[in-house]
C-alpha cells in the first residue's frame, strides 16, 4: 500500500509514495510524500 500526498514515507524502509509522488525528507519531523512535478 502506497503513501499518498503529504503522508509520511521512508526512503529506505517504506511506506513508499504512490505514483507521481516522491519522498521528501526536508520537512520535520520525518519524510513526506510530495508531487514530483
From Swiss-Prot:
Q: Which SUPFAM superfamilies match?
A: omega toxin-like (SSF57059)
Disulfide-linked positions = 2-18, 9-23, 17-33, 25-31
Residues annotated as carrying Serine amide in the record are 37
Instruction: Please tell me where this protein is predominantly located.
Output: secreted
PROSITE patterns, alphabetized: MU_AGATOXIN (PS60015)
* Keyword annotations from UniProtKB, A to Z: Amidation, Disulfide bond, Ion channel impairing toxin, Knottin, Neurotoxin, Presynaptic neurotoxin, Secreted, Toxin, Voltage-gated sodium channel impairing toxin
Q: Kindly indicate whether the keyword Metal-binding belongs to this entry.
A: no
Q: Which body tissues produce this protein?
A: Expressed by the venom gland.
Which compartments does it reside in?
Secreted
A single GO CC term for this protein reads:
extracellular region
**One MF term in GO for this entry?**
sodium channel regulator activity
Q: Which family does it belong to?
A: Belongs to the neurotoxin 07 (Beta/delta-agtx) family. 01 (aga-2) subfamily.
Function statement: Insecticidal neurotoxin that induces an irreversible spastic paralysis when injected into insects. Modifies presynaptic voltage-gated sodium channels (Nav), causing them to open at the normal resting potential of the nerve. This leads to spontaneous release of neurotransmitter and repetitive action potentials in motor neurons.
User: What's said on domains?
Assistant: The presence of a 'disulfide through disulfide knot' structurally defines this protein as a knottin.
Q: What is this protein called?
A: Mu-agatoxin-Aa1b
Amino acid at each position: 500500500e502506497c503513501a499518498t500526498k503529504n503522508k509520511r514515507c521512508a526512503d529506505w524502509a517504506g511506506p513508499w509514495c504512490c505514483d507521481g509522488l516522491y519522498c521528501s525528507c526536508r520537512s520535520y519531523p520525518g519524510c513526506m510524500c510530495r508531487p514530483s512535478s
